Amino acid sequence: MKKLFVLFAAAAMTLTASAQALEESKTFDNIYIGINGGVSTKMTGQNGWLGGLNPNAGLRIGRWFTPVFGIAVEGNAYFSNKPWVSTGTIVRFVNTSLLGTVNLSNWFGGYKGQPRPFEVIAVAGLGWGHLFGNDANYKATTYHNNLTNKLALDFAFNFGADKAWQFYVEPAIIYGLNDRTDVVSRNLANDGLQYNANHSFVQLNAGLVYKFKTSNGTHNFKIVTPRDQNEIDALNSQISD
C-alpha cells in the first residue's frame, strides 16, 4: 500500500514537472537593434498624396521583458517637409519616441518556445519632434519642437538561425499633439493637446532587426521544464525500498 501511494505521488510529481515555464532573463537579455526606412505623407491638405511623400530613415533599440511586452527607443530623420516650402536643410525634421511594444501573436496564441515565422506587434508611444531650418521664415518663428504620438502595427517575419533576424513592414500614424502646422507652417508648439487629423501624417516603413544572443544560448526566450531533483531522488529511493 505504501509503495502504491509513493507511485501515485511520483506520477503526480511527473505531471507537475511537465508544466513549462520561461527561463529567467538577465538584465541584458532579449535586447535588439534595428534600422528602418520608408515614406510619410500629411494626412490632410494634400493635392494628391503621391506628390507629398517624404522619405525617412530611422534606428530602433529595444528590449522584450516577456514574450508579450517590451519597450523601445526609436529615432527617425525626415528628408523632406512637403507640402510646405523647403526649410533649406538636408534633414528637415526628427522624431524621437519612447515606445511600448505588444506582441499580439504571443498574447492571444501563447509563446511556443520560439518566435512564429509571422507575428503581429502593436507599437505606441510618445515622442519629441524637432523641425530644422536655416531660412528667414524658420528664424522668424518661435516654436520648433512638439509632442508627438505614434500608433503603429508591425507585420513581422522572423528568420535565420534561432530566429535571430526579423523583417517587418509597419504602417503608422503619427500625431503632432500640440502643433498648428496647418495654419503656421513653421510654428509647431503653439496650441493645446489634441488628436487632430490636420496635425498628423501617415507613414509606411520597412525595417530589419537583429536580436542579440541571450544568456540562455539562443536569441529569444527559452521555455524550460522545472524539476526538483531532490524530491525525485527521495521518491525513487522509497520506491526501491
Regions of interest found by a model, annotated:
Residues 20-30, 68, 106-120, 159-165, ...:
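Short loop/turn motifs that connect adjacent beta-strands in outer-membrane beta-barrel proteins
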Residues 84-86, 160-241:
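Predominantly the C-terminal beta-signal and adjacent terminal strand-loop region
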Residues 69-149:
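Gram-negative (and chloroplast) outer-membrane scaffold detector with strong preference
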Residues 37-43, 75-81, 104-106, 126-132, ...:
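Transmembrane beta-strands of outer-membrane beta-barrel pores
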Residues 32-34, 70-72, 121-123, 166-170, ...:
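Residue-level detector of the transmembrane beta-barrel scaffold of outer-membrane proteins
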Residues 31, 55-59, 94-98, 102, ...:
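Hydrophobic, lipid-facing positions within transmembrane beta-strands of outer-membrane proteins
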Residues 20-62:
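Short glycine/proline- and aromatic-enriched beta-strand/turn motifs that initiate or cap beta-hairpins
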